[in-house]
């Protein structure tokens, strides 16, 4: 788990201007300095521990997470973190219905897989115009669904960076009762997420630090699951 010193060095404590605050974030605010709200880092640690414990338990049961962040400066970071812990990601644009209209989204994912598997031989049977249409379609599907390519069912955990920008994803999670973990700045609403993590959501250092901790928890859950299976196998071998 990270320390207060590490969080201070990564600007986790720096919130938005006082006039931009959401009163519902009051319990996570330590005070104000030079017109900015200062986040209570002890609260951040408590919230982060809750989120990490939830991730470890969930992953141990076989659940997988979907990372959501369409902020341009954080998209590459989010993708790297998601891949590091074998999770799914959305970093280009949240298409309405990714969760609430899952059947349509699943069809799009299957179409992407189908187009990716098509052999060069098949392409040679098409006209130049048909090949161009297919190429454009594949590129469009890849742009929006490459991070969900192996997702065969609706995710049971969604990790959101930037609540206000990803409000549609937040609402879909809320509507379906999907557990969401959200990095919340002082202008956000903690009542819209199951596991709020009060933190600066505008700093690459802050977001990177929080995501790394969440990523480690997911990998820890996976390792625990593997260990459990191995222990069961050893027990079975002894009995047989």
UniProtKB/Swiss-Prot annotation:
<keyword id="KW-0934">Plastid</keyword>
<dbReference type="GO" id="GO:0009507">
    <property type="term" value="C:chloroplast"/>
</dbReference>
<keyword id="KW-0150">Chloroplast</keyword>
<dbReference type="GO" id="GO:0003735">
    <property type="term" value="F:structural constituent of ribosome"/>
</dbReference>
<dbReference type="GO" id="GO:0006412">
    <property type="term" value="P:translation"/>
</dbReference>
<keyword id="KW-0689">Ribosomal protein</keyword>
<dbReference type="InterPro" id="IPR018130">
    <property type="entry name" value="Ribosomal_uS2_CS"/>
</dbReference>
<keyword id="KW-0687">Ribonucleoprotein</keyword>
<dbReference type="InterPro" id="IPR023591">
    <property type="entry name" value="Ribosomal_uS2_flav_dom_sf"/>
</dbReference>
<dbReference type="Pfam" id="PF00318">
    <property type="entry name" value="Ribosomal_S2"/>
</dbReference>
<dbReference type="InterPro" id="IPR005706">
    <property type="entry name" value="Ribosomal_uS2_bac/mit/plastid"/>
</dbReference>
<dbReference type="InterPro" id="IPR001865">
    <property type="entry name" value="Ribosomal_uS2"/>
</dbReference>
<comment type="similarity">
    <text>Belongs to the universal ribosomal protein uS2 family.</text>
</comment>
<dbReference type="GO" id="GO:0005763">
    <property type="term" value="C:mitochondrial small ribosomal subunit"/>
</dbReference>
<protein>
    <recommendedName>
        <fullName>Small ribosomal subunit protein uS2c</fullName>
    </recommendedName>
</protein>
């Amino acid at each position: 788990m990270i320390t207060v010193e590490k969080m201070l060095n990564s600007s986790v404590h720096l919130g938005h201007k006082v006039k931009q605050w959401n009163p519902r974030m009051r319990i996570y605010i330590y005070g104000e300095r030079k017109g900015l709200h200062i986040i209570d880092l002890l609260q951040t640690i408590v919230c982060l521990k809750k989120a990490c414990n939830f991730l470890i338990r969930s992953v141990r049961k076989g659940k997988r997470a979907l990372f959501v962040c369409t902020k341009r400066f954080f998209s590459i970071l989010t993708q790297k973190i998601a891949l590091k812990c074998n999770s799914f990601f959305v970093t280009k644009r949240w298409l309405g219905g990714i969760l609430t209209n899952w059947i349509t989204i699943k069809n799009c994912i299957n179409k992407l897989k189908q187009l990716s598997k098509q052999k060069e031989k098949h392409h040679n049977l098409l006209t130049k115009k048909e090949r161009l249409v297919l190429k454009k379609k594949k590129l469009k599907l890849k742009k929006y669904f490459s991070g969900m390519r192996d997702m065969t069912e609706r995710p049971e955990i969604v990790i959101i960076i930037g609540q206000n920008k990803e409000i549609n994803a937040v609402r879909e999670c809320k509507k379906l009762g999907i557990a969401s973990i959200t990095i919340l700045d002082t202008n956000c609403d903690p009542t819209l997420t199951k596991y709020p993590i009060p933190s600066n959501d505008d700093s690459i250092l802050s977001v990177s630090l929080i995501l790394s901790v969440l990523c480690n928890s997911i990998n820890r859950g996976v390792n625990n699951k593997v260990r459990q299976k191995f222990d069961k196998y050893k027990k079975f071998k002894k009995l047989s």
